[in-house]
């Protein structure tokens, strides 16, 4: 009775292997972000900005300078997600015995010769090279069986890197301004500010992982935001906030069994490891702070190099 119940269960498991719900990770559909990815990217950015310690800026007028690493791109993952034929790969062939009989035609040749009163008679028997009859007989039955495991592997990932998405940069800027406003800190134009706050967004992207085992499978999408910030008093050029790093990771995970499911979907956010290199240990030469704070606003002649206006002016005038 148990054996009869076990057979249809095993049959159903093998038939339903690789059947489930596919969620585009990281994206399917012409490069457009889908809702889960948007949620993760926004969550990691919100957490990183919300965790900024801004107490030293209370009562000050702040000018914000935000620089973002290029993050926009597109990618596709092909292959992977194995299907089970069986747990092993092999083949067994049982071939029947085959016997073939050939019948070759034979012909007789007689030659008579006479010379000087003597007569000779020669008789020869020859066999043709081509058979006149062929008969093939097979004894026994033949069979062929095979077992196998077809694995698509981890898949092939192809990506394309583009420039920074201006909408992502604007979104980050709005998040920062929102947090400053809710903390009671005034964000003003650079001309009216007494404090400069610099925020460098080093990491702002997604990570996709796939786990493939015989019984357990998982799809994971992670979004990370890592930033470093500091604040400078314009009057005395002192650091109100020394360089600090915030790093958060939001994750979405689908769990499968034999690629059936997902039977469990989980989401979460947590702090992650910081930047590989930060500026928290940098000190000014001779315990002296420069006359001008770094600037991320570049004119047409030095665009993209991050020089301050004072440094550019000195360079043009030939000053050291």
Swiss-Prot record:
Organism placement in taxonomy: Bacteria, Pseudomonadati, Pseudomonadota, Betaproteobacteria, Neisseriales
Organism: Neisseria meningitidis serogroup C (strain 053442)
Membrane topology label: Lipid-anchor
Compartments it resides in: Cell outer membrane
This protein's UniProt keywords: Cell adhesion, Cell outer membrane, Lipoprotein, Membrane, Palmitate, Signal, Virulence
Lipid attachment site numbers (S-diacylglycerol cysteine): 19
Lipid addition sites, N-palmitoyl cysteine: 19
Family: Belongs to the MafA family.
Full protein name: Adhesin MafA 3
Signal peptide: 1-18
């Amino acid at each position: 009775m148990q054996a009869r119940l076990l057979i249809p269960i095993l049959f159903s498991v093998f038939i339903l292997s690789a059947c489930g719900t596919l969620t585009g990770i990281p994206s399917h559909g012409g490069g457009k972000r889908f809702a889960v990815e948007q949620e993760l990217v926004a969550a990691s950015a919100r957490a990183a900005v919300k965790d900024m310690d801004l107490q030293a800026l209370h009562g000050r007028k702040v000018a914000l300078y935000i620089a973002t690493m290029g993050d926009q791109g597109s990618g596709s993952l092909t292959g992977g997600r194995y299907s089970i034929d069986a747990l092993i790969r092999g083949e067994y062939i049982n071939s029947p015995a085959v016997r073939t009989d050939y019948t070759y035609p034979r012909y007789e040749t007689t030659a008579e010769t006479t010379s000087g009163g003597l007569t000779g008679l020669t008789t020869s028997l020859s066999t043709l090279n081509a058979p006149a009859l062929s008969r093939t007989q097979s004894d026994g039955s033949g069979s062929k069986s095979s077992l196998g495991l077809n694995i698509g592997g981890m898949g092939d990932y192809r990506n394309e890197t583009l420039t920074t998405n201006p909408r992502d940069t604007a979104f980050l800027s709005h998040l920062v301004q929102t947090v400053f406003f809710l903390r009671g800190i005034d964000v003003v134009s650079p001309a009216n500010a007494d404090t400069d706050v610099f925020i460098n967004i080093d990491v702002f992207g997604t990570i996709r992982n796939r786990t493939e085992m015989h019984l357990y499978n998982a799809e994971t999408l992670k979004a990370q935001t890592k930033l470093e910030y500091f604040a400078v008093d314009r009057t005395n050029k002192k650091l109100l906030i020394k360089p600090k790093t915030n790093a958060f990771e939001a994750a979405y995970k689908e769990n499968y069994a034999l690629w059936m499911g997902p039977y469990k979907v989980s989401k979460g956010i947590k702090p992650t490891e910081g930047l590989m290199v930060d500026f928290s240990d940098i000190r000014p030469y001779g315990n002296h702070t420069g006359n001008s704070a770094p600037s991320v606003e570049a004119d047409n002649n030095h665009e993209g190099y991050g020089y301050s206006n004072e440094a550019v002016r000195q360079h043009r005038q030939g000053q050291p």
